[in-house]
Amino acid sequence: CIIHAAPYSHGSGLYMLPHVERGACQVIPASGGFDPDEVFALLRSWKGATFFFAPTMVTRLINAPGLAAADTTNLKTIVYGGAPMYAEDCLKALDLLGPKLVQIYGQGESPMTITALSRAVHTDVGHPRYHARLASVGPAQKGVEVRIADEDDNDLPLGEIGEILVRGDVVMKGYWQNEAATAESLRGGW
């Protein structure tokens, strides 16, 4: 099941689609929002529970006083995204909750499908770049190309700051009845 402690208008709403496809239950907390103690209470009743959390929600969960007494065995996965996750918080969550984390990155024009940091990457502590990988958004998904460009649309070298450009079937085809905005946003298929 998926427990919606995050807004439907963001990742939780989009991430519910694969759960609906599989006939999984959808649980809406009575508070209508995120409360760590309510999450712990819901975990007692729902096996195989998945959540979509912003990184701040993960941080609040792992720092909640109630976590020490909470039974999190029913927690299957926390998918997180929507903002950067501090590597220290990620490590603490892995230590306290076990291998339950998956990170996803998307944009409004290419929702939740650009890059991902898998459960396996989160737990591959022997990798020489383990900590750097935890601080990243992961590799591009299959069928998605990603590049970083400057203001003149030139590719930038690794490590430089620029605009994230995406190409692939997951990218929108255009803005509804707004060709000018489409032409401005989708340049050369990017």
Label the model's feature ranges.
Residues 6-10, 46, 106, 154-155, ...:
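AMP-binding (ANL) adenylation modules
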Residues 139, 154-159, 163-190:
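Conserved ATP-binding/catalytic segment of the ANL
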Residues 21-24, 48-53, 62-132, 145, ...:
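Gly/Ser/Thr-rich phosphate-binding loop
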Residues 57-58, 85, 171:
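Alpha-helix capping/helix-boundary segments
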Residues 1, 9-49, 64:
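Conserved AMP-binding/adenylation subdomain of ANL enzymes
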Residues 136-143:
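Short coil-to-beta-strand transition motifs
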Residues 91, 135, 180:
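Active-site phosphate/pyrophosphate- and oxyanion-stabilizing loops and adjacent acidic/basic residues
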